[in-house]
Each structure stands twice: as C-alpha cells, then as structure tokens.
C-alpha cells in the first residue's frame, strides 16, 4: 500500500497550477448522458473518481471518443445499459448523479446505493423524493434504486435539506422534463452554477442557479457542444492553508478567488497577506498563525471540505480555536491522527476545541478520508521530523499530483510503495 513520507519544517515558495474541480467535473460528465450528440469537456482533473466515472459511463454505453490529458469527448448516442452496479458505485458516491440523466433520457435507471468516504450518513432520499414528484416510479430492491417513467413532468420540489448532488441530479433530470420544475432550498455551490452553465450551453433553460430557488423549463432535446470545468476551489484552499501553516510565499495560478470568499477571509484572520488577480491568488505568511474559529455550513458559508485542513493550521496557532461541524457527523476522524503528532484537541459532540502548540512532532498516521488526508499532509509539513501518512488512496480520489505540486514549492514529500 502506498504511503507519503514527509520531512517537515520547510517554508513554501513558488507557483502551483490548480486543476479542474472534481466536484464540478463529475456532474458535467454525467450531463453527457442527456444528449445523443458528441460532448467535449475540458480542464478535467486526472483523478481516480474521474476514471471511475468514465468507466461507469462506458458500461452504460457511452463511447469515449477522445481522452487526452485535460480533455475528454464523449458520445451517449446509444445508451445500452442504464445500470450502475455496486462494484462501480461502492467507491464513489457521485455515481448517483447518473440517476437523473438516465431517467430523463431513457425512462429507466438501475442504480446501486452509493458508497464513498466514510464520513457519516449522506442519504439519497432527496433525489428519490424529487424524481417521484416528477412522476417517476421508484423502488429500492436488494440495494438498488429501480426507477422508471414515461417522461418526467415538471414539478415544484422543496428539498428538506440542502444537498449539492440532489440539486444537480434533479436539475439535470428537469432539463428534459415536460413543463417547468422549481427547485426550492437548492444548493448554491459554485459547482452547481458550473453545471447549470454547462446545461445551458447544451440548450437547457435554467434560471437562478447560485440562488436557493432554481427554475428549469424542460425542452425536448439537448445538443452537444463543449464545456470548460471550473478550477477546484477546495484544492486551491488546501494549498493556501498549507502555505499559511508552513509559512512562505506561493502564487496559485489558474484559479478563482470569487468562490473562496469565506476561506480567504479566515486565512487573512490567521495572519496571511493575500493578493488576488483575475486567475491567481498569492498568499504570503511570515508569522505563526493566529487561531481561527469557524462553523461549517452550506455555501456561501465555510465549506465542510476545508474543515480538516484548517484544523491542522489551528493545531500550531498561537491560541485556542473552536471548530464546529454542522454538515456531516463523524467528520472529526482526523483528530485522533493529529493527536499522534501531539496536537492538543478535544472533541465535544460536533465541536472541536483546538489548543495551538508551538510545534508538532512527526509520527506515522493513517488517512481516513479524502480531506483528512490533506489535513495530515499539512500537519506533516509543519511537524518536526518525519511523518508517514498511510492509506493515501483517498488522496487520489480528489487531488491531482498533490505531492508533486507541493514538492515544486519546496516541500520535502515523496510517495513510496
């Protein structure tokens, strides 16, 4: 099993190029199911979840016309098998995103209940309720969602909780429904906006993406075309947090600051100097971080996907911080590993109290999920001595060449078998 070996203590200097966003690329790949015409997607990151999604689409009957670095062209002219098997879905929750497009395009879908990171219950009931409101007949049998419909009908759907994949699934399904669909309590994440822009480019009629009410007027068909996936805001935030923790001066290129307002504000609160350009962000840190308290919540609030990285930052901050997780239960699994590096953290329910100490000490730790992996890398970069991060297969689901990108700005990090 592969591991990362990190020798901490180095400041970071230089430039890092940001990849396309995994959480935008996956739904855009699924959107290719909505048209019989070729569809090209650019700025796709080379990640394990993307590879898994492409394999799933091929099983469904999608032809991959080209698959070059950063660009993939797909053709879903002949969908032969509207099924996502357990073997394909178990490692990637985003596979649920084929449900809406398959049902809208073919009238049927057989989708295994999803897996993914082990960070708590993330039910798909909002997807199912929404599609049922649009006229679909759905049953759960032997761990599979069995769905069928003649043609979906527009409906007013008020989601009980804010769900990004639920919003994306229902928005895609509604593009080919008869009539108008109104999604209430919709997710506002930039990735939802990116998907909406992709669908509009294919001929969909969508208004309100980025707000909590989205209106979709169904059309008879969507056409092909191309779409450029937005930069990864979580990768951007992860590298910025690493620089703020380690100290140094790094510019991230090919990214967007407008999707990271709250994160940038918290980094400034920690003491970082930040400059912003049209497609770049520069962060300079020349002092010990100040503690940053935060509370995760749906966008545009502080993202749950950045909570673990900020915990690593707070572990060596000059004071005490309070971090509250409101999105997922069981998303403090990295705390136990941070304490192996001598971090001083207490967990009380959904709140972690982090007492910053001057120095972490290197040790062997084990990654438990994708963002916990990033947290432990940052912790290793600031720890004295050697840190070994085990079970890093999580990393390859969401970060493209993270160790190479860190090494090019001065981190002492390498992957070993």
UniProtKB/Swiss-Prot annotation:
Q: Which GO terms describe its cellular component?
A: cytoplasm
Positions carrying 2-(S-cysteinyl)pyruvic acid O-phosphothioketal are: 117
| InterPro entries for this protein | Enolpyruvate_Tfrase_dom, Enolpyruvate_Tfrase_sf, MurA_subfamily, RNA3'P_cycl/enolpyr_Trfase_a/b, UDP_GlcNAc_COvinyl_MurA
Reactions this protein catalyses: phosphoenolpyruvate + UDP-N-acetyl-alpha-D-glucosamine = UDP-N-acetyl-3-O-(1-carboxyvinyl)-alpha-D-glucosamine + phosphate
Q: Which UniProt keywords apply?
A: Cell cycle, Cell division, Cell shape, Cell wall biogenesis/degradation, Cytoplasm, Peptidoglycan synthesis, Pyruvate, Transferase
Query: What coarse category fits the chief subcellular location reported for this protein?
Result: cytoplasm
Q: What is its EC number?
A: 2.5.1.7
- Quote the record's binding site residues for phosphoenolpyruvate: 22-23
- Any one GO molecular-function label of the UniProt entry: UDP-N-acetylglucosamine 1-carboxyvinyltransferase activity
| SUPFAM superfamilies listed in its UniProt record | EPT/RTPC-like
Q: Where's the active site on this chain?
A: 117 (proton donor)
User: Binding positions for UDP-N-acetyl-alpha-D-glucosamine?
Assistant: 93, 122-126, 305, 327
The domain of life is: Bacteria
Please state what class of enzyme this protein is: transferase
Q: In which pathway does it act?
A: Cell wall biogenesis; peptidoglycan biosynthesis
- Compartment list: Cytoplasm
Biological process per Gene Ontology, one example term: peptidoglycan biosynthetic process
Function description: Cell wall formation. Adds enolpyruvyl to UDP-N-acetylglucosamine.
Q: Which family does it belong to?
A: Belongs to the EPSP synthase family. MurA subfamily.
Spell out the protein name for this chain. Answer: UDP-N-acetylglucosamine 1-carboxyvinyltransferase
Source species of the chain: Nitrosomonas eutropha (strain DSM 101675 / C91 / Nm57)
């Amino acid at each position: 099993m592969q591991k990362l070996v990190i020798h901490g203590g180095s400041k970071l200097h230089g430039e890092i190029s940001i990849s396309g966003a995994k959480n935008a690329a996956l739904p855009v790949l699924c959107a290719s199911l909505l048209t019989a015409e070729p569809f090209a997607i650019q700025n796709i990151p080379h990640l394990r979840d993307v590879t898994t999604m492409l394999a799933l689409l091929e099983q469904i009957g999608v032809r991959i016309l080209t698959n070059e670095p950063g660009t993939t062209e797909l053709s879903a002219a002949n969908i032969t098998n509207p099924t996502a098997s357990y073997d394909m879905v178990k490692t990637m929750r985003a596979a649920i995103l084929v449900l809406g497009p398959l049902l809208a395009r073919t009238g049927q879908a057989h989708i295994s209940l999803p897996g993914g990171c082990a960070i708590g219950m993330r039910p798909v009931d909002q997807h199912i309720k929404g599609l049922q409101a649009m006229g679909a007949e759905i049953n759960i049998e032997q761990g599979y969602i069995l769905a069928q419909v003649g043609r979906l009908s527009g409906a007013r759907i008020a989601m009980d909780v804010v769900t990004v994949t639920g919003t994306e699934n229902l928005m895609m399904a509604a593009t080919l429904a008869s009539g108008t669909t109104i999604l209430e309590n919709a997710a506002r994440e930039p990735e939802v906006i990116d998907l909406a822009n992709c669908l509009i480019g294919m001929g969909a009629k969508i208004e309100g993406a980025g707000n909590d009410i989205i209106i979709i007027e169904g059309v008879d068909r969507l056409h092909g075309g191309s779409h450029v996936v937005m930069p990864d805001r979580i990768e951007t935030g992860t590298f910025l947090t690493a620089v703020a923790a380690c100290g140094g001066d790094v510019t991230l290129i090919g990214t967007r600051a407008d999707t990271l307002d709250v994160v940038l504000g918290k980094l400034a609160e920690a003491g970082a100097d930040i400059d912003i350009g049209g497609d770049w962000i520069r962060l300079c840190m020349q002092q010990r971080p100040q503690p940053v308290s935060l509370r995760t919540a749906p966008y545009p609030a502080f993202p749950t996907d950045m909570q673990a990285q900020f915990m690593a930052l707070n572990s060596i901050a000059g004071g005490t911080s309070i971090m509250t997780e409101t999105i997922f239960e069981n998303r403090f699994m990295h705390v136990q590993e941070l304490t192996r590096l001598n971090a001083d953290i207490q967990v009380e329910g959904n709140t972690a109290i982090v007492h910053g100490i001057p120095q972490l000490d290197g040790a062997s730790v084990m990654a438990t999920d994708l963002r916990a992996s990033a947290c432990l890398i940052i912790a290793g970069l600031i720890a004295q001595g050697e840190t070994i991060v085990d079970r890093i297969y999580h990393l390859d689901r969401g970060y493209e060449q993270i160790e190479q990108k860190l090494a090019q700005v001065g981190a002492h990090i390498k992957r070993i078998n």
